[in-house]
C-alpha cells in the first residue's frame, strides 16, 4: 500500500490491471487511492472544514495546475498538497496565515510565471472559502 501511495508501485499496478481496466480507469483508481489516503491524514488536522469538500476543491486546483503547467504531479506531491492546502485553508479562515517565507522578495522576482500559475490554479480555494493566499503560502506550495 505504501508503495502504491508513494507512486513506486504504480507501474506494477498498471501491469496487473492492464487486461481488466483501461488507462482512464487506472488513473481514476490511483487518484481515489491518493485522495482517500490524504483524507485519513487530514481528519486529524482539520476542525472547521468539511474534509470531503476541501479535498474536492484541492483536487480541482491540482488538476488545473497540471493543465496550466503541462506536467503531471507525483503521488507524493499530491498527498503533500492535499494536506498542506487543507491546513492552509483552515489557517486562512482563522486569519493565521504563515507570513514568513525565506527570501520572499527574491522568490517573487525569480518565479513570476510559477506564482501566476499557482494563483490561477488555486483560485478555486480563494473563491470557495473567501480567502486570499499570500505570497508566503504560495512559496510553500511551490516548494512542495
Locations of regions flagged by a protein language model:
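A cross-family "folded-core" feature that marks the main globular domain of proteins
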Residues: 1-144
